[in-house]
Amino acid sequence: MKEEFDFESIKNKAIEQLKAGKPLLGKDGAFAPLLESILNAALEGEMDAHLTEEERQMGNRRNGKMQKQVQTALGEVTVSTPRDRNSSFDPQFIKKRETILAEGVADRIIGLYALGNSTREISEWMEENLGNRVSADPISSITDRVLPEIKTWKSRMLDSVYPIVWMDAIHYKVTDERGCAVIRAIYNVLGIDREGHKELLGMYISRNEGANFWLSVLTDLQNRGVEDILIACIDGLKGFPEAIQSVYPNTAVQLCVVHQIRNSIKYVGSKNQKEFLKDLKCVYQAVNKESAEKELLKLEEKWGEQYPIVIRSWQENWDKLSEYFQYTPAIRKLIYTTNTVEGYHRQIRKVTKNKGVFPSDTALEKLVYLAYRNIRKKWTMPLANWATISQPLAIKFGERFKLL
């Protein structure tokens, strides 16, 4: 027979603990038994409601109970979930496999996880605040609550036109199904919408970075409603421009000038690097494309014999490297590098920097998405100079980008 809940004894215990300077809340708090009784009564009530006359006629009956420990704001309690013969009882007050019931605690756990805290650090926080340490599995199950949100976010429809888009990948180590640490690339597509707001259009995990996978990324954007991209800013990955223009043939592609400079200087002797960079600056900082091409000829005359591969790389990629000269200084500053998406990556790395190897692709995706979710809270205002940027774009691209 179930022992009746003795409210008087709980009250007396609470008074004694107050006199002794002990807490009412937490693992050994006086209020936990009261909450435990209420929760168990609620579960019993749910089972009574479940076992309707129709259920009973079908032979369904109570079939014992299953105990589990549940963390609450008042401390840890033991709940006894009733079971039925047909295993059709699905409690809602305390759901199956739910082990944390404290109001706001699940959100707090997800918030701590989003800041890069490990499950051990979160467990320590719970011990300090709830009075009981929790293992990694329940914490991981709490953070899994964000997975349906990620799925919905990744399949959401997008705007039809984005004036500027940056595409770049960030790399992490992940444990694969064999238990080996492997490299994973997260492909990020960061755009500016018509109103000048930043928007992460999508993130995609793959085994490595390549033009073929970028093609699938671009196809996904198209399937989600993106009909046109005016300017795409990318690094120098081979085949990338062709992948873009196979899906968006009218898109202007700007190769990252900074990437090109970094790649160039690696093949210039250390004693000549300072002078070479000074001459190269005259090319990419020229006032217009015509002047830049004259400076590129001078660069070839001076350094072409000594560093032919470097000069040839600039010449072969010139059309995509010099796209930015067609635009105003404000637009040039935005598009001649992939600094915008790299800046986003730096913010992500602040959260992930202490993670050596992620246990799975899912764990990686959860943390990066939650970090992004915090970052996007700051993307409430359009770019400061959007008015001076959008109007020249509207004039240049005409029907493709109407402001009014």
Across the structure, where does each feature detected by a protein language model lie?
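Conserved beta-strand -> loop -> alpha-helix junction used to position metal-binding or nucleic-acid-contacting
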Residues: I231-K238, A243-D279
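Short, conserved DNA-binding cores of transcription-related domains
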Residues: M1-T99
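DNA-recognition alpha helix
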Residues: R120-G131
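RNase H-like nuclease fold core
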Residues: P82-R85, F93-R97, N129-R133, R145-I234, ...
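Metal-dependent DNA phosphodiester-chemistry modules and their immediately adjacent helices/loops
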Residues: D90, S264-K294, K298
